[in-house]
């Protein structure tokens, strides 16, 4: 879930016609034609698309987005069949299922599904993985440039310290930043009580003076360059920044972090269902997952790939957040329209 900044309200449920056969012809691997993939920016290596095309003969047409809401809006604004595959996060999947926007997956075509760690299967947002399979996940952690920050940071709450004025890069993601504020106060990231949200807003706005930059696309850049000394950014971005600047460290907040999992899904009305299934199954191959993790080192749910990567991945806590960190965290959930309106107003006030 890489970038999720634009707050939109849940649209009314839309009816989409079922794709005839619902994958009934997908039992054999497709080997020609094309597939239209709509994914996060800086999240799937070009080399993976190239290798898939070479191996299968299927041309991959790639479009990108910077937030779940951006993706949802674009899919709804385009004609049905414009995109075959999307890569939504946990909470967005729940919404898209409710709006009948996703095609059921042909499990017989997913011969590589057994490579996924059982811990990441059968999620609450898609019981039985009827519509989705995991790609990558991670947490919103704290990046600290120890050469510029003298004090120890251990929590989301520490980010509100006035001494950090003008030093923060934070995700351009309303659910992440508001959720982080809620967690720092002992509340849920999915808080709906207007009275509690008023308390959260009051604290949220005190963060404004500390924020130098909102960036979800490449927040590591500000950390690597030294323009920002502290960040509330995705764990993989911290891992990449640590490779460039040895003074940068990762801190997992003691309150428990924002946790996410992004998942492959096929849109209703897909014109290339068989090719889409072939692509998703390819992404579940261990070698493919290794290539992905080498370039974008997020939490890898592919157990076979993790075994191949060895200690460089498994013992790097920025690339591979410890199990206890994940267990202490919280996933974002869908919220009702009235609550989303409050969140939107809070976000607008923070950024104005």
Where are the model-predicted features located?
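Mature extracytoplasmic/periplasmic domains
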Residues: 267-327
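Periplasmic-binding protein-like
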Residues: 197-206, 244-268
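Conserved C-terminal helix/tail region of periplasmic/extracytoplasmic solute-binding proteins
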Residues: 323-352
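Early extracytoplasmic/lumenal segment of secretory-pathway proteins
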Residues: 28-95
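A ligand-binding cleft/hinge motif common to bilobed small-molecule-binding domains
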Residues: 93-95, 230-247
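Short, low-complexity disordered leader/linker segments with a strong preference
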Residues: 1-35
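Extracytoplasmic ligand-binding site segments that recognize negatively charged/polar headgroups
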Residues: 45, 66-68, 82-227
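Loop/turn elements at helix/coil->beta-strand transitions in domains of secreted/extracellular proteins
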Residues: 33-34, 56-58, 81-84, 164-168, ...
């Amino acid at each position: 879930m890489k970038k999720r900044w634009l707050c939109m309200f849940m649209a009314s449920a839309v009816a989409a016609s079922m794709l005839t056969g619902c994958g009934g012809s997908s039992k054999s691997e497709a080997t020609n034609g094309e597939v239209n993939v709509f994914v996060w920016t800086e999240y799937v290596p070009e080399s993976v698309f190239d290798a898939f095309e070479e191996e299968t003969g299927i041309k991959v047409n790639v479009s990108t987005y910077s937030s779940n809401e951006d993706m949802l809006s674009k899919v709804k604004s385009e004609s049905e069949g414009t995109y075959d595959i999307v890569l939504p996060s946990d909470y967005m999947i729940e919404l898209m299922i409710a709006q009948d926007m996703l095609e059921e997956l042909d499990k017989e075509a997913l011969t590589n599904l057994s490579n996924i760690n059982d811990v990441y299967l059968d999620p609450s947002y898609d019981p039985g993985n009827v519509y989705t399979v995991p790609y990558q996940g991670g947490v919103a952690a704290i990046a600290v440039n120890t050469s510029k920050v003298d004090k120890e940071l251990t929590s989301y709450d520490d980010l509100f310290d006035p001494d950090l004025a003008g030093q923060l890069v934070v995700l351009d993601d309303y659910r992440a930043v508001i959720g982080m504020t809620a967690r720092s106060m002992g509340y849920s990231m999915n808080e709906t009580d207007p009275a509690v949200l008023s308390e959260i807003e009051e604290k949220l706005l005190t963060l404004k003076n500390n924020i130098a930059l909102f960036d979800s696309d490449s927040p590591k850049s500000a950390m690597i360059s030294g323009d920002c000394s502290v960040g509330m950014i995705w764990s993989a971005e911290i891992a990449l920044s640590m490779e460039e600047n040895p003074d940068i460290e990762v801190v997992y907040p003691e309150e428990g972090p924002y946790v996410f999992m992004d998942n492959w899904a096929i849109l209703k009305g897909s014109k290339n269902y068989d090719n889409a299934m072939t692509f998703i199954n390819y992404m579940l191959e261990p070698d493919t997952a290794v290539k992905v993790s080498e370039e974008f080192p997020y939490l890898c749910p592919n157990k076979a790939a993790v075994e191949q990567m060895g200690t460089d991945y498994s013992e790097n806590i920025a690339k591979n957040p410890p199990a206890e960190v994940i267990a202490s965290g919280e996933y974002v959930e869908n919220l009702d329209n009235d609550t989303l309106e409050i969140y939107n107003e809070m976000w607008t006030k923070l950024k104005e």
